[in-house]
Amino acid sequence: MMIAFSTGSLHTYGLARVAHLAAAAGFDGLELMVDDRWDTRDAAHLRAVVESAGIPIVSVHAQARPGNRGWEEDEVARLHRAVTLAHAVGARTVVAHPPLRYRWVSLRHPPFITLAMVTPFRQRSPYRRWLLAELESYQAREAITIAIESMPRHRFGPWLADLFEMNEIRDLRRFPAITLDTTHVATWGVDLLETYEVLAHCVAHVHLSNYDRRQHRLPQDGSLALGPFLAALRRRGYEGAIVVELQPDALEAGDEGRVRGRLAETVAFCRAHFIADPHRRGIDGQAAWMKDSASLT
């Protein structure tokens, strides 16, 4: 088990700065959030960044939104490319979203403006069919874990809307591996611990953050009882990564001292509730990564 930090938590910072902050705070690894910045998909640059910071990339979050330049529009092709990138940087897990229920439209006005929005028009994407028919065999061939993420629901007045297909508990149970996102589960209006007990057999990856009507809050600050959740992971022998995934404002991005302090507090919270011997686990995890990374060069 590793406590990792999503680079998307400080997406307004450069990758090198994020990597060094995470390493200094005591995180064991990084989850790379692929976005519209070229640096998030350049394997050689990424290897140089993490080697300099002394922290591994343990997972890659596939590009989730169409319309980003230099990245495929097709959802299956985007996932394949994320797997290729994961192999290149030594990551063992790729996080992918389930299919969007509605069609996505991107509008560009060169050179800088890109607008993206979900339309009210339903779609039945080839990606959904691929997940049902080919995901398991593809994952086995690639020798990598592809963990489909539990996504949020959105409230419109009295209605709770799900913009994603295959995002019900009964659907997620069918995947060989999932990413359980705690703040997203909070938007469903269900009990987190009960949900985990139902899905535990397929939870291979965790996105950890709290909820206070805003998503992706600090684990130690919100309405979710994440201490008992971490203890439940430990009791069940969970061996995957626990990735802290936040919004920049939760860390008070822009204030270096506050960012460093909140990151350190978050690592301490996670270790206190999960790891009996935090120093040993962190050293063992990083040593294993350093050995694997040497084989990539």
Walk through the language-model features, giving the residues of each.
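Active-site acidic/histidine proton-transfer and metal-coordination neighborhood
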Residues: 16, 52, 69-177, 292, ...
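P-loop/Walker A phosphate-binding loop and immediately adjacent motor/lid segment at beta-alpha junctions
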Residues: 218-242
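Short acidic/histidine-rich active-site segments
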Residues: 243-249
